[in-house]
Amino acid sequence: EVAPSEKWLGLLVLLSVTDAGIFCYEPETYRPKEDYEVDVGKSQLHPSRKIVADLSQIVERFWESKLAEGEEKGRLQGDGAVCSCCGATGDVLSVYSKAWSWFTTTWPGPLSIFLNENELVNGVALCPDCYKALTFGSNLFNRLTTTLPMWLTKEMFAPVDNASSREHRSEAEDIFGGVMALPVLDPSEQREEDRAEYVESLMHMAEGVTEKKGAGALHLDTITGIEQELPMHIAGEDMYRLTMLYFSGDPSRGDVHLRASIEDVLPSAAQELTDMIHDLFDDSYALQGQLFKEPLHERASRPYRSLPAMLSKAYGMTRMWSSLAQTLHRKSLPRDLFVRHAALRMQDLSRKVEDKYYLLQHEVFFYLYYDQFLHHYRQWIGEEGGYRVTPWQDLLRLLDARAYRDIDIDGVADLGFAAGYLVRRFSRLYYHHTDQKQFLRDRVITFGSKLGPDTIVEYALKRMIEYAFKLKFDGAFAKDEELLGLVLAEYQRQTDDVRRQKDEFMTSFWAGYCLNRGKGKSEKDDSSTRENEEAQLMSE
């Protein structure tokens, strides 16, 4: 049943019924030929008969009408009529037609100023066979194309260097994406059963993603953002290559703005990359628990389970498409730019760290999470050298246990992490001995100054013993003076490296700061702030 409020649609068809035409009468007991005929309905004029349609004749009339549409922009015949696609001669039609909406003339495209609209066939033309192939292909491509999720497009267009602006992301324009699987071999070189399976797989893809994932099928949304399912016949064979097309605008009018075209992607590479991201997120539950006390909600975790979302946050919208192509082609990804953007976002949040603490935690999570992704990715593509990754769990375990003599501060990242951990521990003591004052806000980040390595050393680390003595918690802080001495000594030894790798130091500093959960209360109860900001993240 249809609800009264639901919109009803109807189709009125005028049929010319004859004894041997496209539509003809047949006895009620007549069974239409499978794949060649179809029942239209019972005859009202002849109750004992029904109307049957001849599909083969309908197809012929369909192509006649489609070719007539193409002829509206011009048709050429003779030896001088050459197909722009296959080179056949004799009969060609204009490509600017209704075969594909991208080739319509309803927008100010780069059409020849020397040709009238009905003479466009002299520009680009197709023979009838290629015109039919274009019609088939365009309809299939339209069925394989979908709109990217709004949360993903908002993530893509969000500022890469300002965390506060990312909170107030406006509606972004729609971006369309489509995935095509193309065979490596020419169809003439394929076995008949392979061609049949390929066509069946394309039809499966055109139906869209099913609720129940097919056996062996690969969902491509993780690495492409496109809700598309790759059937097992294609996903399990490298005899095919994937092509992704991203565009915006109004495709129905041919007003298309191409964003990216990524070709020659191996299905096996797509599968391995998808598995890598899934495994990476599963392995991040310990980090989620350390930062947020509980796993991220489904909506809040979406950006960390999407390759396009991660790349846009790491490198920005302007480099996201090229980075996506590099990743799908197993090429090197830069790390310095990702660290730079992470440092800028953390610096923006540090100005109001007590109010933006939950967002800062998300930035720290992304920094450690994507850094681990880069580490696994470089191993996957066989890239040698690079950088050393110290598992945050190992360093945090030693710091929590105050096993300072066992700590090997190897590099700027380890130094920044230890400094951040120590500042957070001292801030907690300062908070409980100063009527709940904020150490960073009131003593370190003052008068609009920016927090950097020199500021941390001069106004935080070097004054800790003095503040602890004046506020009478020097006894409680005495257990951490060994760590303070270690950090200051290492800073003096690595000063030049820190200045060259300032972003590395600061991102690691905030990682150590946020991962220090402590055993008592934090400087400020940020549960209400967390709930508000988490609700905002989940609503997007």
At which residue positions do the language-model features occur?
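Short functional micro-motifs and their immediate structural scaffolds
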Residues: 90-92, 132-135
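Short recognition patches in nucleic-acid-associated and regulatory proteins
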Residues: 88-116
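Extended alpha-helical scaffolding segments
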Residues: 1-41, 45-49, 93, 137, ...
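Short beta-strand-alpha-helix junction that forms the catalytic/metal-binding core
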Residues: 112-133
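Short metal-coordination and nucleic-acid-contact micro-motifs, chiefly zinc-binding Cys/His arrays
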Residues: 75-82, 120-123
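Intrinsically disordered, low-complexity regulatory regions of eukaryotic proteins
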Residues: 4, 8, 68-70, 82-83
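Short Cys/His-rich Zn2+-coordinating modules
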Residues: 46-72, 104-113
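Short cysteine-rich clusters marking metal-coordination/redox-active sites
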Residues: 83-87, 127
